[in-house]
């Protein structure tokens, strides 16, 4: 559509039909074009038709969306907790803080376990990334990033490298060595580059590829060695806040969540969204696959956690209580999948019975909001990070 049209005629060549005629200067996208009266009318009509087409397409999309929800509702004949009525209730549940990791000078924003079940990497608003020995609480490596708010970090499957990023819009990979005095920053490799902050990153099943999520509304798959973009994933309508790779050796799908209230499942080979779920009422802060890979959980600012069954293509459970009014910032499953651990902005960690939908425990200890939470690879413990500058290992 035109910005504005002046009805002052001049004589010359029309920029559309190239005939010598009386012209009208027309400003389109701040650029002056000279059209004859016939072409100017055609352009105005085309603009109206374009608006009508967009409106009809939007209406058709909403209609199809409604029909899809109707078809889903026909299959929604039973709830998960009804199926689980005959399942035995969980016994007494006790977990305590076994280790407290202190060393960050500001809010802990992200953490990840090494496959060796012992080491932990964490990132913070203080601009530091620290590798910890969770048994001794000693710091093994520390990297100072060029920016604050290091919002994402991940351990490589081999345990020989870490990846991190944040407000620098980049994902950087640092190799780890046995020499603790070696300058890690000198070996830094910038792998991914987004147009907005990096919110999450995760290696695939090898050290050679990494997935990233960003505030620019996209996810991307990168080659670590060359830094080449292998695949980009477009579909979220706002910042992407989290992602999780499907738990299989040939994991070719991942799930992401964002500020558009959506959780989306992607095919890494085609770059296409294969499933989308939009039942949350606020930002989706965290997503985590069920151990079998057939479902995933999400945590949101709407103070609920939800379970989605990928085979049934729908939400099957909501984990919430009237007394919980603060958002869920991070979620993860126990190794068996029976428990769902969820960190909240009210400083607590709630433990949910996945099958029955009931809360089995509430863990206190942090003095500020719980920002990140991950279960160890062997399932014997989990680690939580908080805005109180500490990480806690629970078992």
Curated annotation (Swiss-Prot):
First and last residues of every WD repeat: 103-142, 145-184, 193-234, 236-278, 279-318, 320-362, 365-394
Keywords: Membrane, Repeat, Transducer, WD repeat
Tissue occurrence: Isoform 1 is only detected in retina. Isoform 2 is detected in brain (at protein level). Isoform 2 is detected in brain.
The species this protein was found in: Mus musculus (Mouse)
Localization per Swiss-Prot or TrEMBL: Membrane
Keyword Repeat: yes
PROSITE patterns documented for this protein: WD_REPEATS_1 (PS00678), WD_REPEATS_2 (PS50082), WD_REPEATS_REGION (PS50294)
The protein's name: Guanine nucleotide-binding protein subunit beta-5
A single MF term (Gene Ontology): protein-folding chaperone binding
Family: Belongs to the WD repeat G protein beta family.
CDD domains membership: WD40
Superkingdom in the source lineage: Eukaryota
């Amino acid at each position: 559509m035109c910005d504005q049209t002046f009805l002052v005629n001049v004589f010359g060549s029309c920029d559309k039909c190239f005939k010598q005629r009386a012209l009208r200067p027309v400003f389109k996208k701040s650029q002056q074009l000279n059209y004859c009266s016939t072409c100017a009318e055609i352009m105005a009509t085309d603009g109206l038709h374009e608006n009508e087409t967009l409106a009809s397409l939007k209406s058709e999309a909403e209609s199809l969306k409604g029909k899809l929800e109707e078809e889903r509702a026909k299959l929604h004949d039973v709830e998960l907790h009804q199926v689980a009525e005959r399942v035995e209730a969980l016994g007494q549940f006790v977990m305590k803080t076994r280790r407290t990791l202190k060393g960050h000078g500001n809010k802990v924003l992200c953490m990840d376990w090494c496959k060796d079940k012992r080491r932990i990497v964490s990132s913070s608003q203080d601009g530091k990334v620290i590798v910890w020995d969770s048994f001794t609480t000693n710091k093994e490596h520390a990297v100072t990033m060029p920016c604050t708010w290091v919002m994402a970090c991940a351990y490589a499957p081999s345990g020989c490298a870490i990846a991190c990023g944040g407000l620098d819009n980049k994902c950087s990979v640092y190799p780890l060595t046995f020499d603790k005095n070696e300058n890690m920053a000198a070996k830094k490799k910038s792998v991914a580059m987004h147009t907005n902050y990096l919110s999450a990153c995760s290696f695939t099943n090898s050290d050679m590829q990494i997935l990233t999520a960003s505030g620019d509304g996209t996810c991307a798959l990168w080659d670590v060695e060359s830094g080449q973009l292998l695949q980009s994933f477009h579909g979220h309508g706002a910042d992407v806040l989290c992602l999780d790779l499907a738990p299989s050796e040939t994991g070719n799908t991942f799930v992401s969540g964002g500020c558009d209230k959506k959780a989306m499942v992607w095919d890494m080979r085609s770059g296409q969204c294969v499933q989308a779920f939009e039942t949350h009422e606020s930002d989706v802060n965290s997503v985590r696959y069920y151990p079998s890979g057939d479902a995933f959980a999400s945590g949101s600012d709407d103070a609920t956690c939800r379970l989605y069954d990928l085979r049934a293509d729908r939400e099957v459970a909501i984990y919430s209580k009237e007394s919980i009014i603060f958002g869920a910032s991070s979620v993860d499953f126990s190794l068996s999948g029976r428990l769902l651990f969820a960190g909240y902005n009210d400083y607590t960690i709630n433990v949910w019975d996945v099958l029955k939908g009931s809360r089995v425990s509430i863990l206190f200890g942090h003095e500020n909001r719980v920002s990140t939470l991950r279960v160890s690879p062997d399932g014997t413990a989990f680690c939580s990070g908080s805005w109180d500058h500490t990480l806690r290992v629970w078992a």
